[in-house]
A protein has these predicted regions:
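Acidic/His-rich segments in extracytoplasmic proteins that coordinate ligands and/or metal ions
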Residues: 87-157
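Short hydrophobic segments within beta-strands
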Residues: 41, 247-249, 335
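An N-terminal, globular interaction/scaffold subdomain
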Residues: 37-39, 44-94, 102, 109, ...
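Redox- and metal-dependent alpha/beta enzyme cores, enriched for Fe-S-associated oxidoreductases
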Residues: 32, 49-63, 70-71, 251-312, ...
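A charged, amphipathic alpha-helical module
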Residues: 2-36, 149, 153-271, 275-286
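Proline-aspartate-enriched helix->loop->beta-strand connector
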Residues: 101, 324, 328-333
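Peripheral docking tails and interdomain loops at the edges
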Residues: 2-3, 348-387
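A short, acidic, amphipathic alpha-helical segment used as a generic capping/interface helix at domain edges
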Residues: 90, 311-328, 345-346
Length: 387
């Protein structure tokens, strides 16, 4: 990527608010300086391979209903809001990360996403990782290893580079350090009372998915953990001692941090554990940087992530129960985005597992609009009152 390559802004740039304009200028300047930028949309994306290509990786999952009307010009209305929002931001050119990315890495998780990627590819080069539907058969693991190899090859060909094993090992060490910092921050919520607002925790983790500099973000997290720990040890208690301790599980929470997370915390609860695909159960999975076949170690780490698209998926329920014990959970709230069939169907098994352990459970099926806010607040308040 040559330096000082002119990066044009969208034709609608002047219509954006100042915050969005500033975001576009920031990413434009980053790209114009010759930097590489790759968008991704799923926790199964092997980020170490992108890192090893010298590219910054940014999450592109849509979390707002702002652009859904634009998306529905192409996509069906009765589709998951995350899918519609993601496509809508690309279609309307309102997301600077999508607009300026060199390419997007998609994956065959749910049916809606994998078909949306065909349309997204018409707007922006999109490479698809073919994720197997399970991982307990040898050919599935071998197939995924090949997908990771093909991603490495795609990035090498696109950028005209060679990604070495040493490059991958450096990337693994950086990501391991980041995940260790995330785990330390998650662990602060095991304190009784919790050391911070769960909304603050979720917002901090969500913001990290837009960072161009892994090491800088890792240092920020490490410093924040130290400050929070020191404040807690000094007697600061930002969370009430009688706040009911809630674990959130289910679909990605980025689009419902305020809708569900803040509602929990304004009704006598505190979110002590994020048990979605960007939470502790995924961050806890490290990679051995000294593994003889480092690419295979990377591939294996990602395939072992628990998600409702996998069959079987017993590990997710087992992990949730372990998190309930670790974080002294009073109740579990499962967030299911409308039309997310895999999480919606699997919620029956989650409810059975959680209630079988003697922990109250509630499922909330919602989208990114505010139309059901009153109903959700009533249900959450009633649920917390029973704990």
């Amino acid at each position: 990527m040559s330096e000082n390559t002119e990066q044009p802004l969208p034709s609608t740039f002047e219509e954006f608010n100042e915050q969005r304009k500033a975001a576009f200028i920031r990413v434009k300047d980053y790209k114009q300086a010759g930097n590489r930028l790759v968008g991704f949309l799923c926790s199964y994306t092997p980020l170490e391979i992108i890192d090893a290509a010298g590219a910054a990786s940014v999450a592109l999952c849509g979390t707002s209903d702002e652009v859904i009307p634009e998306a529905e010009k192409v996509l069906p209305a009765n589709l998951c809001p995350l899918i519609k929002s993601t496509y809508g931001f690309a279609y309307s050119q309102k997301c600077p990360f999508t607009y300026f990315s060199d390419m997007i890495i998609g994956e065959t998780t749910c049916d809606g996403k994998k078909k949306m990627y065909e349309l997204l590819n018409e707007l922006k080069r999109t490479h698809i990782l073919h994720l197997p539907q399970g991982r307990d058969r040898a050919y599935e693991r071998e197939g995924w290893y090949e997908e990771c190899r093909l991603l490495k090859e795609e990035l090498e060909n696109f950028y005209g580079i060679t990604i070495t094993d040493d490059d991958l090992r450096v990337a693994v060490r950086r990501r391991n350090r980041l995940r260790a910092a995330q785990l330390e921050m998650f662990a602060l919520q095991a304190n009784q009372p919790a050391a911070m607002s769960g909304v603050d925790l979720m917002s901090t983790m969500f913001a990290g998915t837009f960072s161009f500099d892994i090491e800088a973000y890792t240092q920020q997290l490490e410093q924040k953990v130290v400050k929070l720990r020191e404040a807690y040890d000094a007697g600061e208690r930002p969370v009430a001692a009688d706040a009911k301790r809630i674990l959130i599980t289910g679909c990605p929470v980025g689009g419902v941090i305020n809708k569900i997370g803040r509602t929990i915390e304004s009704n006598g609860g505190v979110v002590v554990c994020m048990d979605d695909c960007s939470g502790e159960r995924t961050a806890a999975m490290m990679i051995d940087p000294e593994a003889p076949d480092i690419l295979r170690a990377i591939a294996d780490r990602y395939l072992d992530i628990n998600c409702s698209v996998m069959t079987p998926n017993d590990g997710r329920m087992e992990n949730t129960l372990a998190m309930c014990e670790k974080y002294h959970v009073d109740g579990v709230v499962e967030s299911v985005l409308q039309a997310c069939h895999t999480f919606n169907v699997e919620s029956a098994r989650m409810q059975e597992a959680v209630e079988g352990a003697g922990i109250p459970y509630m499922k909330i099926e919602t989208d990114y609009s505010n139309g059901d806010m009153g109903q959700i607040e009533t249900r959450i308040a009633a649920f917390i009152e029973t704990l």
